[in-house]
């Protein structure tokens, strides 16, 4: 994933439009369809959690959806802190949103927090994802959405799709969407 140049943006709305434009310009049309999936499944979501924040593209969607509590987990929040954090903090105050950031690995107890929707876009290996799912799955009330479930590192690879689907089936979740355009995303819903 590219590091978008976002020093010129002055609002969360502009950040969201610009990061999507730059990412899709670099990675192809439909790279950011996960943004649309977050919006599509946002009904009834008040508490959002994201593991793997990078610069905050999907986090900006959560802000624009005005989820009441947004938890952002990443081993390094430096890229988020550089551009989105200052915009997010003022936006959160204006819209009565609580933002919680945790600079830690998504497989650790320190990363735990309950949510209605969990978005996973961290380390793209099934062995890593299964640990995140086993730790966080019981704390998610509605949806788990994973990015990069059809292509990883430019090559067809559905290991994250299979991991999420199989974990979901074993734990009472239902597969509701599997998008294979570009890098893809997958959505499961608590059964």
Identify the role of each PLM range:
Residues 1-3, 191:
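Short, Lys/Arg-enriched, disordered terminal segments
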Residues 20-23, 27, 31-191:
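S-adenosylmethionine/decaboxylated-SAM
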Residues 5-29:
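Class I SAM-dependent transferase core
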């Amino acid at each position: 994933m590219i590091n978008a140049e976002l020093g010129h943006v002055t609002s969360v709305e502009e950040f969201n439009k610009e990061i999507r434009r730059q990412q899709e310009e670099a990675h192809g049309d439909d790279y950011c369809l996960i943004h649309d999936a977050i919006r599509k499944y946002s009904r009834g979501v008040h508490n959002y959690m994201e593991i793997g924040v990078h610069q905050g593209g999907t986090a900006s969607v959560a802000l624009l959806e005005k989820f009441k509590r947004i938890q952002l987990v990443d081993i390094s929040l430096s890229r988020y802190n550089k551009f989105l954090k200052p915009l997010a903090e003022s936006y959160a105050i204006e819209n009565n949103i609580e933002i919680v950031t945790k600079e830690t690995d998504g497989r650790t107890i320190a990363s735990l927090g309950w949510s209605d929707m969990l978005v996973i876009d961290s380390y793209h290996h099934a062995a890593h994802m299964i640990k995140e799912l086993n730790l966080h799955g019981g704390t998610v009330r509605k949806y788990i959405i994973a990015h990069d479930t059809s292509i990883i590192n430019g090559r067809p690879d559905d290991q994250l799709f299979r991991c999420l689907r199989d974990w979901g089936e074993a734990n009472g979740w239902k597969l509701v969407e599997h998008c294979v355009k570009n890098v893809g995303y997958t959505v499961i819903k608590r059964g």
